[in-house]
Amino acid sequence: MKLDFSIGQGADIVVNYILDNFTPALDAIAATIGFVANGVQDLLVAIPSLAGIVILTLLSLWRVGWKFAVFALLALALVEHMGLWRAMMQTLALVLSATLIAVVLGIPLGIAMARSQRVAGLVRPVLDLMQTMPAFVYLIPAAMFFGLGVVPGTIATVIFAMPPMVRLTNLGIRQVHPEYVEAGLAFGCTPWQLLFKVQLPNAMASIMAGVNQTIMLSLSMVVIASMIGAGGLGNHVLTGIQRLDVGAGFEGGLAVVVLAVILDRITQSLGKGGSGLFRRLSLRSAAASPAGKSAGG
């Protein structure tokens, strides 16, 4: 007796059922994500390239240091010279939108995992599946439910990039020193006060590492998301591959690398307190304060 069961047919039935019965919910999700993604993209694209270069260079100087600021200035000027500034802003908008949504969804989920072993046991296999699934697979449901364009590209990117945000939020809260928690409880903190005044502040370094990893994974989805109309630098790389145009593909890839390095260093500085002008000014301010003078004296 042959068992006739097709996983593919089952998947088709589920997808068709969702499309037939949950179209209003899908439209609401698409409208919300489209509002965020298109709003961020319109804002970034509207900034003149010279102003954008100045802003990112000053931010690099403020958070990282003057050497990296010089690199950022030259690298961004090169991207502008290649005529890829607008495409880079579209890619940055996709990354920021996906990261924002991943943070909004990932931090509460990580908190729930840290507070409940049952939730952690349910969510952890899902995160494992999300991280081991090939990135191309996410394009299929995104395109089927939401069509082509920025919205399905953002959704696929969020699904691919969110697991580190959840895991590192959970890890950061669990690694808060028990003495801090005991001190908070001794002073009469409610569970919510303990979370927001003790656990989250002490887990911030781990949470920012999660943000950094989410941004990097979002950038790694740029070319893949362009296959369903996300646009940006990924579209230039994809066009270069399709036409066997090595130069166009190399330019698009180089611009992605520039954006990745700048975002990586800046977000790392946010988690570690920075090493640039911001940190030096903070140290000078601390040294000039009465407490600093008395300690030094």
Task: Give short role names for the model-derived ranges.
Residues L58-R63, L76-R86, A98-L127:
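Transmembrane-helix boundary motif in ABC transporter permease subunits
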Residues M165-Q213, V237:
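Short cytoplasmic-facing helical segments at TM-TM junctions of multi-pass membrane proteins
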